Amino acid sequence: MTDRVDINRVLMEIRSFKAQNQAMNSVQGVGNSLEGVNNTRGTQQVNGPRFGELLEQAVSKVNEVQQASGAMSQAYIQGDSNVGITDVMIASQKAGVAFDAMVQVRNKLVEAYKDVMNMPI
């Protein structure tokens, strides 16, 4: 009976990975829509990375973590002896935390954008 519960738990985690991967693919479009962020007029040029570049790097990093987690779970499913369930679960949790943080950043950006758009001129 214990083996059956463990199999169900693994299947549930696989479904969770799939859902996270699908959600991550929908968030990847955010990076593409940020191209206009760097177009500024009438502002002073400063040295260092631009906001859009930083945000794009963050989205890319979250994507890398998600891809690594998916690859690790796929390797475990295929029976790779070098990948343990604990490694898969840790990678999954890291990917989940990174994705949740990215969603919160996106929510704050949308909220800030709405605040700026609602400001009287």
UniProtKB/Swiss-Prot annotation:
Record-level Gene Ontology MF annotations: cytoskeletal motor activity; structural molecule activity
Main subcellular location: other
Pfam short name (any one): FliE
UniProt keyword annotations, A-Z: Bacterial flagellum
UniProt-annotated location(s): Bacterial flagellum basal body
GO CC entries: bacterial-type flagellum basal body
Top-level lineage group: Bacteria
GO BP terms, alphabetized: bacterial-type flagellum-dependent cell motility
PANTHER family in alphabetical order: FLAGELLAR HOOK-BASAL BODY COMPLEX PROTEIN FLIE (PTHR34653:SF1), PTHR34653
Family to which this protein belongs: Belongs to the FliE family.
Name assigned to this protein: Flagellar hook-basal body complex protein FliE
UniProt source species: Saccharophagus degradans (strain 2-40 / ATCC 43961 / DSM 17024)
Gene encoding the protein: fliE
